[in-house]
Amino acid sequence: MRTIVLLIASVFIAPGVLAQSQDSDKAGVWLDVPFIKQTVEGCGSASIAMLLQYWSAHGTQIAPEHMDADAIQKQLYSRKGHGIYASDLERYLRDTGFRVFALRGAWNDLREHLSKGRPLILSIEPGGSHAPLHYVVATGMDWQREAVFVNDPARGKLLRIERAEFEKEWQATKNYLLLAVPASAPAE
């Protein structure tokens, strides 16, 4: 019931952002990031497209062709790498007019940036070991239950992953976190 109340409240708090009003430490945050289903080995291009469509919906001017997952895939895909290299994700976002920061992230980094309305591209290793690397978009957190919500281009929108499982999958990629904010956004 509390979740339903919080979801309804999100409509009145700020478009696409959910947080409990005065005591946000008790609830969490959820960003309404559009979901894009990936093609085979297309998690990187789908993740970029989700991120760009989110920022476009929040007032950033982005050419439609730059937000098209298929066009991104054709431009960046590496046959050798069976996907898109992180450095190519970063370059593409810079070329599209974003300030880009690739970090070795921590749980608190997720909380900080999601609370500020900034979705994040993360690299995980589903299952935690020996699976192919996979990009997802972090879209929210449940602070009470210590869980992260992701748009997983292979599995669906707003998937909830418990912290222990998530950190195992994320640590397998050395906690790769990609923060991309419009160049026109104020620096914080």
Model-derived features with residue positions:
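Mid-length scaffold segments of soluble, non-membrane domains
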Residues: 72-120
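Noncatalytic regulatory segments and standalone regulatory/sensor domains
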Residues: 2, 20, 79-81, 115, ...
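Short, conserved catalytic or adaptor-binding loops enriched in Gly and charged residues
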Residues: 21-22, 91-94, 169
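Active-site-adjacent substructure of cysteine-protease-like catalytic cores
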Residues: 99-151
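Short, exposed beta-strand "edge-strand" segments with a Pro/Gly-rich flavor and a Y/T-containing core
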Residues: 61-67, 78-87, 98-105, 137-140, ...
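Active-site-adjacent structural segments surrounding the nucleophilic cysteine of cysteine proteases
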Residues: 2-6, 10-81, 126-129, 144, ...
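Stable alpha-helical elements in mature extracytoplasmic
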Residues: 39, 44-51, 68, 72, ...
